[in-house]
């Protein structure tokens, strides 16, 4: 019986994205350490790259950047994964950022490079619109 690695990898990528969003919403450094690989790099909206060495640095910076918008939580809308290899995939997501009262700040798209590192899948690199 042949194992379908594509379905397995797509499911792992989806679990990583869902776990990452839950970690952000819970402001959980420990969970971010599970779902992000460090050093972690993002290509920001202005095209510049930014890297963080720890989950604490990442979360603090994330919250500071979104404070002005009144960010409270993120709602995942769509996850679409393309398998690149048995150790890497590209995952496109769309999501909404919400204020505490549930009103939408905006809808965004991101591309994540999700890799297997030390037998654990996590987001190594991200690029997005917000």
Write out the residue ranges for each language-model feature.
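A solvent-exposed, acidic/Ser-Thr-rich amphipathic alpha-helical stretch
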Residues: 29-79
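Short beta-strand segments enriched in hydrophobic/aromatic residues
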Residues: 36-37, 95-97, 127-128
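Short, low-complexity N-terminal intrinsically disordered segments enriched in polar/charged residues
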Residues: 1-30, 34, 38, 44
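A short, structured loop/turn motif at beta-sheet edges
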Residues: 81-89, 114-120
